[in-house]
């Protein structure tokens, strides 16, 4: 397989190689936390990986923590990716992502006595976010 350069990515990379990007965060205070944000493009398809780990001065505020995409999407989509929300105590929760043309919102799946349903992620849902808690997003989408 030969490599080919993809124009207008903001970084020089061969097709299929991972590229780091710096997303804009909303309802997330980075503080001394860490972000891993990378993607790779093959044709019009983007594979994205994002992980945020809270430090002692980090926080989740408001509802639906959000980060910007590295390249705008061709479509808006609901539940087009999967998220894992990890509490420092070892508990893990299944999350979902909703995408606009330029951003990703993080939600969580919640169970009641009968159903599993989607809920808003916030400073206290699915747990109260503290140091070493994290969320990881894996998703694919199509660019314009």
Question: Which role does the model predict for each range below?
Answer:
Residues 32-92, 136-142:
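Beta-rich globular "head" domains
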Residues 13, 27-30, 62, 67, ...:
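N-terminal compositionally biased, intrinsically disordered segments and leader/signal-like regions
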Residues 1-32, 74, 136-144:
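Glycine-rich, low-complexity segments
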Residues 22-26, 49-55, 112:
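Generic short beta-strand segments
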Residues 76-144:
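Conserved, charge-rich beta-strand/loop surface module that forms ligand/interface-binding patches
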Residues 30, 39, 60, 97, ...:
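Sterically constrained small-residue positions within well-ordered secondary structures
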């Amino acid at each position: 397989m030969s490599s080919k350069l993809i124009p207008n990515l903001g970084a020089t990379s061969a097709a299929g190689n991972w590229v780091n990007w710096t997303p804009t965060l909303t309802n997330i205070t980075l503080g001394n936390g860490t972000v891993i944000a990378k993607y790779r493009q093959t044709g019009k398809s983007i594979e994205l990986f994002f992980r945020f780990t809270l430090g002692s001065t980090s926080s989740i505020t408001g509802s639906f923590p959000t980060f910007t995409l590295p390249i705008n999407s061709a479509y808006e989509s609901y539940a087009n990716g999967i998220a894992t929300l990890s509490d420092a105590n070892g508990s893990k929760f299944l999350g979902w992502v909703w995408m606009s043309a330029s951003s990703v919102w993080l939600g969580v799946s919640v169970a009641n006595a009968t159903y599993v349903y989607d809920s808003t992620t916030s400073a206290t849902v699915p747990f109260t976010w503290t140091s070493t808690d994290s969320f990881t997003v894996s998703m694919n989408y199509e660019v314009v």
